[in-house]
A protein has these predicted regions:
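The canonical Cys-X-X-Cys-His
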Residues: 32, 39-49, 131, 135
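Electron-transfer interface patches adjacent to heme c in soluble/periplasmic c-type cytochromes
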Residues: 40, 61-98, 119-128
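Glycine-rich, acidic and aromatic/proline-enriched surface loops and short helix-turn segments
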Residues: 105-109
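Ligand-binding pocket scaffold of soluble enzyme catalytic domains
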Residues: 96, 110, 134-138
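Surface-exposed aromatic
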Residues: 113-119
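Bacterial N-terminal signal peptides
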Residues: 8-18
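N-terminal secretory signal peptides that target proteins for export/translocation
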Residues: 1-4
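Electrostatic cytochrome c docking/interface patches
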Residues: 19-38, 50-55
């Protein structure tokens, strides 16, 4: 019984340390989720929808047709929003740092701007990192 008590206590302590070490990252992911889904509403362009307008949850942030076209020509207009998950081509080209830089500066790692209708965000670094942490959690 004594052995089990010590082992159980050791496991609880180790689990507590694991939670403490992950809590900062978890907070960042939660904050990133809020920024992505409630503030910037990235899913409105980057997630495909069903005919009834609801999102296809299994395709969350995996890219979608924009669904609208401007009445007058808009330079750089993109008819589709790319997959912004780590599995997508953009992330594979840019990596974590490139995604963070894009959100901070509004420019790709090569200096290009996002095509319309994507706004050129210029976020604080901690906000950009939180968004990247959330998007990475979508793997």
């Amino acid at each position: 019984m004594r052995r089990f008590g010590f082992s159980g206590t050791a496991l609880i302590c180790l689990a507590g340390f694991a939670v403490l070490s992950l809590s900062g990252q978890d907070d960042k992911v939660v904050r990133g989720k809020y920024l992505v889904e409630e503030v910037a509403r990235c899913q409105d362009c980057h997630t495909p929808k069903m005919d009834n307008g609801s999102f296809i949850k299994s395709q969350w942030m995996k890219g979608a047709a924009i669904g609208v076209t401007p009445a007058a020509p808009v330079q750089g207009w993109r008819p589709a929003a790319p997959d912004i998950t780590p599995a997508g081509a953009v992330w594979k080209r840019w990596g974590d740092d490139g995604m963070t830089t894009f959100l901070e500066t509004g420019k790709s790692p090569r200096g290009g701007k996002a095509g319309a209708p994507m706004p050129a965000y210029m976020l604080k670094r901690d906000d950009a990192e939180a968004i990247v942490a959330f998007l990475k959690s979508l793997q």
